[in-house]
Every structure is written in structure tokens, then in C-alpha cells.
């Protein structure tokens, strides 16, 4: 039975989306000032956009806030502390757990105290090399609570990759676990971390390791300490007030050679933009159940497992499993059914894997997905066959949208919370409010509809995008802003059709860099 959203796909659209989009492009400061009223500030910004030093733009420059406060404390303060913040489900281990906003704040405050006891102060870098467990989310939010800059590295990444990130970030502390689990095998983290520490020129002060049950490892005191031990000796601590343009995190892009490329996120713009996206792009409200099936080591995990859903006050699902093999091709349907998930965000690869294992959807028929309203795909090209297969099976809108590690949120999408637009197979829909997207041809002129070229975004980029690279302003300028003056180069090619729909030819490593 088609949902309300799917029915609206068949009707004539009003100009609601166009009005909002046009306003965001013509009056960006007013548009984002309005959005900024929806988050908590210790000191509200009066300077909305500083354009004095392009391409280094600053949003909400004089604002003072805190990422963790907006993710947790604000909801507890508003009387929603008993609402479920995080659902953890691990079909690999059989472990399940729910955490209310109150409980999660308590755990985060305690681990923030533990980090402080290990000498971590505002501005210090903390590397988080963890599997998909609640402690990984706790570590990220604890860093945000005290103003430390986290750098999450995908658990299981090779020692040399981890070493290069230790060296570039000059991290003070590394937080890890004894192991991660893949279907049919255990990935021992300690030897990988030990190898990285040995290879790195910069020496970390401490390693905090979470011992997974049945997979405990020996720690070498005093540099290596257990999670449980440091938490038992810690007190809960409050949020530190942070300037809007201080950094929330560094996320290194994968697959780079030489010095890793550290994408940074400024605090104020990050909170404002991500909270705005939950309702406007994904049609998710406070208390809704949201699931992003990605990994916290990638940008989708940062933005849509951890930060955006918690900023919005909804319930986010943390899934330690795979689309197939944990235990079967019904794993996703089971999660959606068990927790009454409203929307899922994942990569097309996941659905191709499910389709290959269960082309007729036999597993699907075992579960109740009556609360499920929409599926969002990103990270690589969503081929029309996969989209149509998912639409026919799920009977909900299947929305392909496009974004990058650099942007932290969608450049183009069907904005279901504003107005559902017609699907065009092979397109990632229209540019999202905030992004003035153009196609530039090889002769450096702006393309006409349906003409191919490089996809660029007119500067300034909206809040929540990367203001620079970690300790590499010149590289930021040269890599992204120099080929087309006044524009951000996405390094994707494509065309925009006569209706404003963006059609992409993805870069070869897009799936690696966006979603994994």
C-alpha cells in the first residue's frame, strides 16, 4: 500500500520548494540566521556570515555554543530525557541495548570526565578507532562536550593509515576497542593500533581501550588503560562553551596518497545545517525513529548516525551488522520492523547485495514495515534497476541523493520535508537549499541545460560544509577553489536538465569517500 509520501509523488507540485530554495540563494544570511534560531546558543550570533577573506568564509562568527549540549543536554532540559536517544543492535554478537537521552548524557559526561583526567583539554585531538558500538558514539560526544577535536578512523583500517592520521592530527589520546567483528571473523584491533603507534613519528600520551566481552587483551600500563577503569575514576562534567568557528572534528578522506586530507567541521554551522536537514530533507521530527546503515568511520556515520538525529531529538539506530550474512538478507527488514523505523539511509551497494541474495523479496514478507515511509540512498550511483526493485518491494519513495565528505550534508536531494518532487531515474534530484550548483564546461563557461561539464557550487558554501583542511589552508584553496574562481569544485561531472535535476557521473572512489 503506497504511503502518503509516495502518493504525493504523483500530484502536481506547488512552488513551495522553489520559494524556499530561491530565498536560500538570494538571501543566504537571512535564511541561515532563521535556521540558527532552532539551535541552542550560549551566546547568539549577530555576525551571520564573514566574507572578508574568501574562500575562507565564517558562519555565525560571534556565536558561542556546544555540539554535545545540542545533541543531549538540550533535550533533557526540555523534559525529553526519558526519550530513547540510541538503539544498539548487534546481530553479530546478539547484543541489544537502548539508551535514553538522560542515560546517554550521563555516560558521555562520565567519559568526558575520564578524558579530562587523562589530560585532554579543549583543542586537543583524540583519535577514535572503534567498531560500531555505543562506546564509539559516547567517545565522539564526550570529545565534543569538552571541546576536544575527534578524528574517527574506521575500525580495522591498516596500521600505516592510522599512523598517518596520528602524525597529521598530533593526537594526544587514542580511544579503541579490543576488536571488531565481521561476518565469520574477528578483527583484532590491538595489533593494528600497536603497529600504528610504532610507525607514527608523533607519540600519543595514552591509549584507552574498551574490552569486548570474551575478547579481552593485555594492556601495558601506564600508557594503556582500560575504558572501565578510567570511567570508574571519573566524575560527570558539564559542556565547555565553544566559539562557533572552532573545530568539532577532523575526518580524513580515505584512499589518499601522501599526507592524508583532513576535512574539518566548524561547530556552529555544523549544528545549524544538520538539524535543518532532518526535517527539511528527510521529513524526520522529534521522537521519530531514524536509521542510517553506515559506519561511524565515514561521513554518513558522523552526520546521520550520530549528530543530526540527536540534534533533532529523534531516536537513532546503531547497527553492528551487514545487509546480508547477519544472519540473512532479511537483516534490514528485521531492524525496520523491530524498532518501527520511519526512514532508512544507506548505500545502493547494500540494496544490490540484498537483491542478489533475495531477488523475490521472500525475507521481506516475514516482517511488518507498516511504519516505514522512505528510503534514501547515496554514496555511489544508484542504478535505476536497484531503485525500481526497492520501490516495488517497499512501496515507499526511494530517493537517490548526492553529497560528499567535504559537505557533511546533501548537495542535491528530493527534500521530502519541504515538498516531494517527481523522481527521475538516474538523477539525484535538485540542488538543496543553500547550494547554488552550476555546470562549467571545458572552456570555463556555464553550461546550458543537458550540457556536460564539471559540477561546481558557487561560493560561499552553506553552513556545515568544510571551512578549510586541517593545518592546510593553501591546500584547501589550491585543491578545491582555484580551478574555477568563485566556485567550489566537487570533482564530479554531470549535467543539469531543463527542470533543474542534477545527473552525475560519480568519481571512481565516491563510494569509498562518501559512505563505505
Task: Kindly label every feature range from the protein language model.
Residues 438-459, 495-499:
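Conserved beta-loop-beta connector loops within the AMP-binding
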Residues 506-516:
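Single conserved hydrophobic/aromatic residue that forms the stacking wall/gate
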Amino acid at each position: 500500500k503506497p504511503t502518503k509520501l509516495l502518493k504525493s509523488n504523483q500530484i502536481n507540485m506547488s512552488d513551495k520548494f522553489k520559494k524556499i530554495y530561491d530565498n536560500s540563494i538570494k538571501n543566504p544570511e537571512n535564511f541561515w540566521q532563521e535556521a540558527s534560531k532552532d539551535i541552542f546558543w550560549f551566546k547568539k550570533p549577530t555576525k551571520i556570515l564573514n566574507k572578508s577573506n574568501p574562500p575562507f568564509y565564517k558562519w555565525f562568527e560571534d556565536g558561542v555554543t556546544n555540539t554535545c549540549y545540542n545533541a543531549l543536554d538540550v533535550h533533557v532540559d526540555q523534559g525529553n530525557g526519558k526519550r530513547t536517544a540510541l538503539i544498539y543492535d548487534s546481530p553479530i554478537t546478539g547484543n541489544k541495548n537502548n539508551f535514553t537521552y538522560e542515560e546517554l548524557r550521563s555516560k558521555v559526561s562520565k567519559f568526558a570526565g575520564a578524558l579530562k583526567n587523562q589530560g585532554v583539554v579543549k583543542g586537543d585531538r583524540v583519535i577514535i578507532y572503534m567498531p560500531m558500538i555505543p562506546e564509539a558514539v559516547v567517545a565522539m560526544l564526550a570529545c565534543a562536550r569538552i571541546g576536544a577535536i575527534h578524528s574517527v578512523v574506521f575500525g580495522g583500517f591498516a596500521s600505516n593509515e592510522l599512523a598517518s592520521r596520528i602524525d597529521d592530527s598530533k593526537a594526544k589520546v587514542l580511544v579503541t576497542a579490543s576488536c571488531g567483528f565481521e561476518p565469520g571473523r574477528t578483527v583484532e584491533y590491538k595489533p593494528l593500533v600497536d603497529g600504528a603507534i610504532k610507525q607514527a613519528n608523533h607519540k600519543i600520551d595514552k591509549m584507552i581501550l574498551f574490552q569486548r566481552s570474551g575478547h579481552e587483551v593485555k594492556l601495558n600500563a601506564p600508557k594503556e588503560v582500560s575504558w572501565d577503569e578510567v570511567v570508574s575514576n571519573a566524575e560527570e562534567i558539564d559542556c565547555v562553551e565553544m566559539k562557533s568557528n572552532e573545530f568539532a572534528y577532523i575526518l580524513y578522506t580515505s584512499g589518499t596518497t601522501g599526507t592524508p586530507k583532513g576535512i574539518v567541521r566548524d561547530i556552529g554551522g555544523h549544528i545549524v545545517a544538520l538539524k535543518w536537514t532532518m526535517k527539511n530533507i528527510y521529513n524526520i521530527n522529534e521522537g521519530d525513529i531514524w536509521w542510517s546503515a553506515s559506519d561511524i568511520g565515514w561521513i554518513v556515520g558522523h552526520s546521520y548516525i550520530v549528530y543530526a538525529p540527536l540534534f533533532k531529538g529523534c531516536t537513532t539506530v546503531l547497527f553492528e551488522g551487514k545487509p546480508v550474512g547477519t544472519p540473512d538478507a532479511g537483516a534490514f527488514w528485521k531492524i525496520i520492523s523491530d524498532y518501527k523505523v520511519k526512514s532508512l539511509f544507506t548505500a545502493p551497494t547494500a540494496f544490490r547485495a540484498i537483491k542478489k541474495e533475495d531477488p523475490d523479496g521472500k525475507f521481506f514478507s516475514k516482517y511488518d514495515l507498516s511504519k516505514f515511509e522512505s528510503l534514501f540512498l547515496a554514496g555511489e550511483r544508484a542504478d535505476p534497476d536497484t531503485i525500481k526493485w526497492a520501490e516495488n518491494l517497499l512501496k515507499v519513495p526511494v530517493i537517490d541523493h548526492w553529497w560528499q565528505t567535504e559537505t557533511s550534508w546533501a548537495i542535491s536531494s528530493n527534500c521530502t520535508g519541504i515538498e516531494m518532487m517527481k523522481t527521475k531515474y538516474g538523477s539525484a534530484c535538485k540542488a538543496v537549499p543553500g547550494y547554488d550548483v552550476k555546470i562549467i564546461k571545458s572552456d570555463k563557461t556555464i553550461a546550458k541545460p543537458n550540457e556536460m561539464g564539471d559540477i561546481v557550487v558557487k561560493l560561499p558554501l552553506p553552513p556545515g560544509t568544510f571551512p578549510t583542511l586541517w593545518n592546510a589552508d593553501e591546500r584547501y584553496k589550491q585543491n578545491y577553489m582555484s580551478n574555477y574562481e568563485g566556485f567550489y569544485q566537487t570533482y564530479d561531472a554531470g549535467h543539469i536538465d531543463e527542470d533543474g535535476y542534477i545527473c552525475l557521473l560519480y568519481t571512481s572512489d565516491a563510494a569509498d569517500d562518501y559512505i563505505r
